[in-house]
């Protein structure tokens, strides 16, 4: 599977792009149903109070950091159980429980074809990455021999059996360059029913 991830600073600009003729016509074309491929478009638009991100550095930020105007500097909400939740502004007054269920708006997932699924409020999206581009031999050996195997096991478990725990989907991916060559960067992208479900898995599940 190939995934392209894009971050938009302005929701209106994203909407205009999405509705532009080249994009909309390609997506809506009946040819997409006969390409022999499956296409997925996942759009998430968290409100500011529902969003947090954390970096160990302040320059050349990857991911959503590339479109942020500024960072908050050093923080204390890190390195202890529950720190992720504490970084959400809304967590001061809200437990962030899901308000409803996933809804199939159109189509039938069992039959394939075009299907539209609507999320619910407080659905949790996590993207957590690893970058060993500048790692030395000792650090690489530590990552590949000790850190990656249990990480891969956990990610595969969530991909294959995570729904019973509240994980809607989970993918562990490697970045590639424009020529398709693997880069020394990887990340997990997971969709969960709630932050609480994610916390419970991270806290107590064997994987």
What are the roles of these predicted feature ranges?
Residues 10-20, 194-206:
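Short amphipathic alpha-helices within nucleic acid-binding modules
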Residues 1-2, 7-25, 29-171, 177:
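Short S/T/G/P-rich N-terminal loop/turn motif that feeds into the first structured element of a domain
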Residues 7, 188-192:
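Extended catalytic/binding region for NAD+/ADP-ribose chemistry, centered on the ART fold
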Residues 176-189, 197-207:
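C-terminal functional regions that serve as terminal interaction/effector modules
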């Amino acid at each position: 599977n190939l995934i392209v991830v894009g971050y938009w600073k302005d929701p209106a600009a994203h909407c205009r792009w999405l509705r532009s003729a080249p994009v909309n016509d390609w997506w809506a074309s009946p040819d997409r149903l006969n390409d022999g491929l499956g296409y997925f478009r996942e759009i998430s638009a968290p409100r500011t109070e529902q969003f947090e991100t954390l970096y160990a550095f302040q320059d050349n930020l990857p991911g959503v950091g590339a479109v942020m105007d500024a960072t908050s500097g050093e923080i204390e909400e890190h390195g202890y159980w529950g720190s992720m939740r504490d970084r959400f502004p809304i967590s001061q007054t809200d437990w962030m429980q899901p308000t409803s269920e996933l809804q199939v708006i159109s189509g039938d997932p069992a039959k394939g074809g075009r299907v539209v699924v609507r999320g619910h409020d407080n659905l949790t999206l996590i993207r957590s990455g690893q970058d060993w581009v500048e790692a030395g031999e000792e650090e690489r050996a530590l990552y590949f021999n000790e850190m990656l195997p249990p990480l891969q096991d956990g990610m595969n478990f969530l991909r294959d059996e995570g729904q019973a725990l509240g994980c809607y989907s989970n993918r562990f991916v490697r970045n590639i360059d424009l020529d398709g060559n693997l880069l020394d960067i990887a990340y997990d992208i997971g969709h969960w029913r709630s932050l609480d479900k994610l916390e419970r898995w991270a806290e107590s599940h064997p994987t």
